[in-house]
UniProtKB/Swiss-Prot annotation:
Heterodimer of CALCR and RAMP1, RAMP2 or RAMP3; the receptor complexes function as AMYR1, AMYR2 and AMYR3 receptors, respectively, and respond to amylin/IAPP, calcitonin/CT and CGRP1 ligands. Interacts with GPRASP2. InterPro entries: GPCR_2, GPCR_2-like_7TM, GPCR_2_calcitonin_rcpt, GPCR_2_calcitonin_rcpt_fam, GPCR_2_extracell_dom_sf, GPCR_2_extracellular_dom, GPCR_2_secretin-like, GPCR_2_secretin-like_CS. It comes from Mus musculus (Mouse). This is Calcitonin receptor. Keywords: Cell membrane, Disulfide bond, G-protein coupled receptor, Glycoprotein, Membrane, Receptor, Signal, Transducer, Transmembrane, Transmembrane helix.
Length: 533
């Protein structure tokens, strides 16, 4: 036989094989499309008038399951034959997951699938291959069986952990509201504390207050509502939508069943829940962008050394209150059109990047602001010829003071560890930082501020004097009554006051309603002050 005839013959032999593979794949795809899914049968009480009337979870779960089933059959045909020794169980699709060839007497493990809201993907599924090279059969049904029982086993430990996180959120946001309201009253009553920096603080404090109120309403009204929670595809989601973790574990969704349908989108509780979620997304975005405003202002004062009162706050107002409404509206419209679950709570959609993308950009920018600010602080401290250890101690203090204000913890710890112990530590750490962040910010930037403390002590002393005079016990005023602008001069040299007051020499002093000169507050005591200030 000539070489040419040999090549033609081999080519002709390949054609039937290629046709067989093409026909086989086409038949497989056709069967997947037309055959009913074995584990997600449509509920009998639903009509076939359209997909809109099918359960929302059924649509989401069925799509994921069909994708996994197609990939499994394709994998079964693509993988080479088993190369091990001895008996083994054949690769198979068990109806939910794909299993490779497994040696006899061994147990295969995989993470639980995410088809169902009550499945914990951190848990494991197991499938046993017996000594005869056959997959384990359940004694009751005599059918091959995979152990999915751990996927939705809500143990007492998980439930207790969920309740701890739930009450941690309630306590944290309640304390934050109380501390922030008290701080706002202090800044509003004592006019000698007024300056541009405090004005920015007030707006950021307001976003914390409103956001905490919305979250408390959500925890009290939405989380206990089983109809809303169980019919939404909920998954653990940690960062800014942190409360969903508690919601998912406290009210675990039911498996797909006949009553598991999408609620009426025009129902009052569904509409109110979506409005609440819209407000939460907006206030959360405002919170982070006011953090960005604080970072821009600090960077302008310290790095660019601009101490003038001419900074126009309207640009900060536009960035803090105006810009976040744009991604929030876009997210609401696209969510209603393309992923309209009951309360827009699901994290199983990339539409969340419309909200989280700008937030992450703001956090990253603030992170670089922090690094640059610390660099400038260290440079200034070196110029003062301080001891090296003390210099870095002050730099660390300055860094830790700025972290809760600028939200840097979300950049430093962006992902939850997969390890169970580390994951639990991460949960408690991040939930404490998130829920108590308003309390921490109010404490650091108001209650621990030296000038605020001096002002409050002076007011308390004046109150005691007036009280004594009212009851006839007149006392001579003590020398503890000092003016707020001069109080900074008595700060301890090893302290780190958050604000340093200075008066712009180019501008005349402006008297407020208490007859005192207004002051501007500059962060960090590393900025040199005029001795006569």
């Amino acid at each position: 036989m000539t070489p040419r005839r040999s090549r033609v013959k081999r080519r002709n032999l390949r054609k039937p094989k290629m046709r067989f593979l093409l026909v086989n794949r086409f038949t497989l795809l056709l069967l997947l499309l037309v055959s009913p899914t074995p584990v997600l049968q449509a509920p009998t009480n639903l009509t076939d008038s359209g997909l809109d009337q099918e359960p929302f979870l059924y649509l989401v779960g069925r799509k994921k399951l069909l994708d996994a089933q197609y990939k499994c059959y394709d994998r079964i045909h693509q993988l080479p034959s088993y190369e091990g020794e001895g008996l083994y169980c054949n690769r198979t699709w068990d109806g939910w997951m794909c299993w490779d060839d497994t040696p006899a007497g061994a147990t295969a493990y995989q993470h639980c699938p995410d088809y169902f809201p009550d499945f914990d993907t951190a848990e494991k599924v197991s499938k046993y291959c017996d000594e005869n090279g056959e997959w384990f059969r359940h004694p009751d049904s005599n059918r091959t069986w995979s152990n999915y029982t751990l996927c939705n086993a809500f143990t007492s430990e998980k439930l207790q952990n969920a309740y701890v996180l739930y009450y941690l959120a309630l306590v944290g946001h309640s304390l934050s509201i109380a501390a922030l309201v008290a701080s706002m009253l202090i800044f509003w009553i004592f006019k000698n504390l007024s300056c541009q920096r405090v004005t920015l603080h007030k707006h950021m404090f307001l976003t914390y207050i409103l956001n905490s109120i919305i979250i408390i309403i959500h925890l009290v009204e939405v989380v206990p509502n089983g109809d809303l929670v169980r019919r939404d595809p909920m998954h653990i989601f940690h960062h800014n939508t942190h409360m969903w973790t508690m919601q998912w574990e406290l009210s675990p969704p039911l498996p797909l069943s006949a009553h598991e349908g999408k609620m009426d989108p025009h129902a009052s509780e569904v509409i109110s829940c979506k409005v609440l979620h819209f407000l939460h997304q907006y206030m959360m975005s405002c919170n982070y962008f006011w953090m960005l405003c604080e970072g821009i202002y600090l960077h302008t004062l310290i790095v660019m050394a601009v101490f003038t009162d001419e900074q126009r706050l309207r640009w900060y107002y536009l960035l803090g209150w105006g810009f976040p409404i744009v991604p929030t509206i876009i997210h609401a419209i696209t969510r209603a059109l393309y992923y309209n679950d009951n309360c827009w709570l699901s994290a199983e959609t990339h539409l969340l990047y419309i909200i989280h993308g700008p937030v992450m950009v703001a956090l990253v920018v603030n992170f670089f602001f922090l690094l640059n600010i610390v660099r400038v602080l260290v440079t200034k401290m070196r110029q003062t010829h301080e001891a090296e250890s003390y210099m870095y101690l002050k730099a660390v203090k300055a860094t830790m003071v700025l972290v809760p204000l600028l939200g840097i913890q979300f950049v430093v710890f962006p992902w939850r560890p997969s390890n169970k112990v580390l994951g639990k530590i991460y949960d408690y750490l991040m939930h404490s930082l998130i829920h108590f962040q308003g309390f921490f910010v109010a404490t650091i930037y108001c209650f621990c501020n030296h000038e605020v403390q001096v002002t409050l002590k002076r007011q308390w002393t004046q109150f005691k004097i007036q009280w004594s005079q009212r009851w006839g016990r007149r006392r001579r005023p003590t020398n503890r009554v000092v003016s707020a602008p001069r109080a900074v001069a008595f700060a301890e040299p090893d302290g780190l006051p958050i604000y340093i007051c200075h008066q712009e020499p180019r501008n005349p002093p402006i008297s407020n309603n208490e007859g005192e000169e207004s002051t501007e507050m500059i962060p960090m005591n590393v900025i040199q002050q005029d001795a006569s200030a």
